[in-house]
């Protein structure tokens, strides 16, 4: 019983912070804010995202530390951390998704920022994510998320400091392909 109430408390706290970060940070940051020596094709990615609506957060650097858990290119831009909550903008190239995984010591709040993506909780149907879609994945629940087959996608990831990730098997490529085909 305590675990459920704590999980709800964490989820409620993270959802509240997600809304605040999204509302307050969007006017302050632009996707063009990258260092001059950064090899990321920032202008190309930003143009693609703006063509789908907007790109309010910096794209970040290649997510090379976690590349083995993604099917293609992803970029990570930390936005806040060190105060009990970690907030990052994750940018997925078209067709890029992560493996099935689960988090410990925190739920995960995902907030769609730009483009079109998917998330799926184990045993449930995949759900579309678009700008403004907010999802709370409870602690310990197996899931995946990422871009649709034909669009760039950005989401905020919000978790408590000290959260862990257990990476599991890849998403079935045939199931992902069917999902994208059905969405056309």
Regions found by a protein language model. Name each.
Residues 2-15:
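Bacterial N-terminal signal peptides that target proteins for export
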Residues 12-26:
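Bacterial N-terminal signal peptides
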Residues 31-86, 166-184:
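A short, N-terminal "cap"/entry segment at the start of jelly-roll beta-barrel domains
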Residues 78, 87-91, 109, 126, ...:
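Conserved hydrophobic/aromatic beta-strand scaffold that supports enzyme active sites
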Residues 86-103:
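Conserved short histidine dyad/triad with adjacent acidic residue
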Residues 97, 104-131, 141:
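A short beta-strand-loop-beta hairpin characteristic of the jelly-roll/cupin
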Residues 118, 126, 139-165:
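Ligand-binding loop in jelly-roll beta-barrel domains
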């Amino acid at each position: 019983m305590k675990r459920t109430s704590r999980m709800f408390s964490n989820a409620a706290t993270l959802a509240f912070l997600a809304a605040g970060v999204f509302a307050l940070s969007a006017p302050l940051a632009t996707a063009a804010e990258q260092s001059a020596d950064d090899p990321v094709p920032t202008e190309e990615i930003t143009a693609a995202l703006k063509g789908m609506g907007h790109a309010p957060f910096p794209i970040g650097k290649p997510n090379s530390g976690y590349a083995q858990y993604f099917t293609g290119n992803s970029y990570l831009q930390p936005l806040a951390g060190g105060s009990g909550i970690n907030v990052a903008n994750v940018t997925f190239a078209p067709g890029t998704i992560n493996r099935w995984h689960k988090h410990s010591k925190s739920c995960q709040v995902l907030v769609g920022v730009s483009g079109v993506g998917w998330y799926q909780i184990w045993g449930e149907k995949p759900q579309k994510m678009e700008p403004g879609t907010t999802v709370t994945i409870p602690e310990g629940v197996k899931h995946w998320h990422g871009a649709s087959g034909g669009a760039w996608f950005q989401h905020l990831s919000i978790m408590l400091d000290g959260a862990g990730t257990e990476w599991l098997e890849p998403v079935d490529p045939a199931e992902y392909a069917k999902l994208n085909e059905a969405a056309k």
